[in-house]
Structures are given as structure tokens and as C-alpha cells.
């Protein structure tokens, strides 16, 4: 088993840096870490083999600033006949809503995501997802989004994001993997 583990290290190659290692300063993400996050995104990342080619833009208009994304999903994403799997629809919403709240100063992590499915979201048709921030108070950011196939509203979502210190989150999660005893007893 040890030999297999050693061989595995050669197959895996050097460890890729994680997106948050790219440039969080004082717990706030910078442009470099944001760009790294996009490359590693499960739903649109160039470094993620299963991610569909989702185009995402920031749009400024009379109603304010929002994110608009377009994507066409093929058979690999099918759930119901001719429709996108609902879990994937929810995941796309989380990704698009997350991008929206990252336009704010000090973004956060998803605290709640509510999805309302209005119609089966079709595969092999261009989908448009639009997301915007509706509330920003203290540590809480609220954002909403819609998914359309042409003029057809297929789903809508609302998310609550909680602002966190990403440096602190990284430290706490890394400590969970550290087998050394905690000297503070906490």
C-alpha cells in the first residue's frame, strides 16, 4: 500500500494551489484569488473537466449591477427526460449567486440556498441565468437569480450569504486535518 501511495504522488503531479491561497489579504479576497476561483469553479472552471462552457458577465443597467451567464447543457447533465438534473440547476444557481455577491465588499459563504423549480430546464438549449443582490446588511448578503430558456422561466433562487474572514476559515479547516494536539485545549 505504501508503494501504491508513493506511485500515486508521481501520477498526481505537484499539488495545485487552492483558489484562496492566491491572494486573500486580511481575510478579504482580491482579484487574483477571484480569478483563481473562477478557474477552479465546479460549474464553469477552465480547470474542471466536467464544467460546461458557461460564459459569465457583469452587467450594469438602470436596475443596477448584476451577473448574467449563458450556458447550453448536453446529455451529461440530463435528469428528467430532455431536462437538466435539478441538483445541477441548484449548483449553477449557487455558482452564479456566489459570483454576484463577490461583487460586494467582503463576500461570504452560502448560508442558505432556496430553489423554486417552475418548469423542467431543457438540455441542449441555451440557458440564461441572471443574478443580483437584493440586500446587504452587516454580515448578511441576500441575492436572487432566475434561469430562462428563451422566454420560459424554468427556475428561480434566493441565497443568503454570510460574510466570513477567509483566512480564519482556512486556518480552522486546516487545523481539523492537523493530527497534533491542540495546546489551548479548545
Model-identified regions with their sequence ranges:
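Short, low-complexity Ser/Thr-rich regulatory SLiMs
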Residues: 58-60, 119, 133-135
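Active-site helix/loop of acyl-thioester processing domains in fatty-acid/polyketide metabolism
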Residues: 59-66, 84-107
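Catalytic strand-loop segment that frames the active site of acyl-thioester-processing enzymes
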Residues: 41-84
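Short Pro/Gly-enriched beta-strand edge/turn motifs at strand-loop
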Residues: 35-41
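Hydrophobic residues positioned within well-ordered beta-strands of beta-sheet architectures
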Residues: 67-69, 113, 129, 143, ...
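HotDog/MaoC-like acyl-thioester-processing domains
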Residues: 1-34, 121-123, 134-186
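Hydrophobic residues in beta-strands and at strand termini
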Residues: 71-73, 117, 163
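Hydrophobic beta-strand-centered segment that forms part of the acyl-chain substrate-binding groove
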Residues: 2-9, 96-128
